[in-house]
Design a protein with these regions (language model features):
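A well-ordered secondary-structure block
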Residues: 88-164
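Polar/charged alpha-helical tracts
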Residues: 3, 65-68, 72-73, 116-120
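Classic N-terminal secretory signal peptides
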Residues: 13-16
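Short, well-ordered surface patches within globular domains
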Residues: 33-95, 140-142
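Bacterial N-terminal signal peptides that target proteins for export
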Residues: 1-11
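C-terminal motif of bacterial Sec signal peptides marking the signal peptidase cleavage site
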Residues: 19-23
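Bacterial signal peptide processing site
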Residues: 25-28
Length: 164
């Protein structure tokens, strides 16, 4: 009977140790501040798309890679020189025969940020271009990346639309 108790205790200790090691391994999805910001932006995008009865989009790996690259290459102290109201941003539009992309970088730490307002102001002068970035229901792919720089969170969003 004592051997059975010892064996049970040993098995329980081993199982708890294994559980602790797998829980702390970090092998799953990230939950750091960058990942949380990315998830919030994707939720906001998909909530807006739901209002237009458009299908939800996932954080596309190719678009996210472009967003991350733009975010890494940007001089966040100097490049965010456009401004709408109280927030500063940077944008870059790439035209292609079939699809075109818009990458937007902005500081994420302000509250009540309206992504549609930012995109609407940026694309206001591009009405002649047959591109319609300012309606989320027209987006075919989206990628979101975030970084923390000097204690502030910055996001880069790359949107893709089909040309019409």
């Amino acid at each position: 009977m004592t051997k059975l108790r010892k064996l049970t205790a040993l098995l329980l200790a081993g199982a708890l140790t294994l559980l602790l090691l797998t829980a702390c391994s970090g092998g799953g999805g990230s939950s750091g501040p960058e990942a949380q910001a990315e998830a919030k932006v994707m939720r906001a995008i998909n909530n807006d798309r739901a209002n237009s009865r458009a299908a939800p989009l996932s954080n596309d790996p190719d678009m996210q890679r472009i967003a991350k690259k733009k975010l890494d290459q940007a001089n966040l102290d100097a490049d965010l020189n456009g401004s709408i109201g109280r927030y500063k941003f940077y944008h870059d539009v790439k035209y292609d025969k079939e699809t075109s992309t818009l990458t937007l970088i902005a500081q994420y730490d302000y509250h009540n940020t309206k992504l549609e307002d930012l995109i609407g102001c940026i694309t206001e002068n591009n009405k002649a271009s047959n591109l319609n970035f300012n309606h989320s229901s027209n987006w075919t792919k989206v990628g979101v990346a975030a970084t923390i720089y000097n204690g502030k969170t910055y996001i880069a969003i790359t949107l893709q639309v089909k040309t019409t």
